[in-house]
């Protein structure tokens, strides 16, 4: 969800009857625009409003995708394995996206900068990862999500390193959101 003035934007997917899910952005209580053509399944997982430009992160045809307003901006993966963009943020003039692709039977978290893979979010072999939120402050990139091993463990990454483990690992936990207020560089 994004808010601008008195307008509320929401995004997700819409499926009617036997059609494939469409990636849709709503403005207030009406469909604002559709981002996909219905030929392949698509959906939006996150929005970022920068000035008057609305960015949407999601998937189309099994590939991670980012849209700028109504137009496809980046296809982040080649579609050879299922992938989704799960988070998007803009810092200055740079767009960052987090998401995942499947590697065999495991999800592997990734952060992209301007449509190019910047780094992956791994905890080593046998442990997948799933980012749900990304925030950037100057040169610091933070991602919140989950690593998979014997349990699901909520973590926050700083760059490609785990900064905080948010649970003790005895049960399942997932971090879905975060917010970076400010950083002081000394």
Residue map of PLM features:
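Repeated scaffold domains used in trafficking and secretory/extracellular systems
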Residues: 1, 41-48, 82-89, 128-136, ...
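Recurrent small/Gly-Pro-centered beta-turn motifs in extracellular repeat architectures
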Residues: 11-14, 56-60, 98-101, 143-147
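Short loop/turn motifs that cap or connect beta-strands within the blades
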Residues: 31-41, 73-81, 118-127, 163-172
């Amino acid at each position: 969800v994004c808010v601008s003035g008195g307008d509320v934007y929401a995004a997700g997917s819409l499926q009617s009857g036997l059609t494939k899910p469409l990636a849709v952005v709503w403005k207030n209580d009406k469909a604002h625009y559709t981002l996909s053509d219905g030929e392949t399944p698509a959906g939006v997982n996150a929005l970022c409003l920068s000035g008057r430009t609305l960015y949407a992160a999601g998937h189309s045809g099994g590939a991670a995708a980012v849209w700028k307003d109504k137009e496809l901006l980046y296809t982040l993966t080649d579609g050879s394995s299922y992938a989704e963009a799960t988070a998007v943020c803009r810092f200055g003039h740079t767009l960052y996206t987090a998401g995942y692709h499947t590697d065999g039977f495991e999800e592997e978290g990734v952060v992209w900068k301007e449509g190019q893979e910047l780094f992956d979010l791994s905890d080593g072999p046998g442990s997948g990862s799933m980012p749900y939120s990304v925030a950037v402050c100057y040169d610091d990139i933070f991602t919140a999500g989950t690593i998979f091993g014997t349990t699901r463990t909520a973590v926050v990454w700083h760059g490609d390193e785990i900064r905080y483990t948010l649970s003790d690992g005895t049960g399942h936990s997932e971090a879905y959101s975060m917010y970076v207020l400010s950083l002081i560089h000394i």
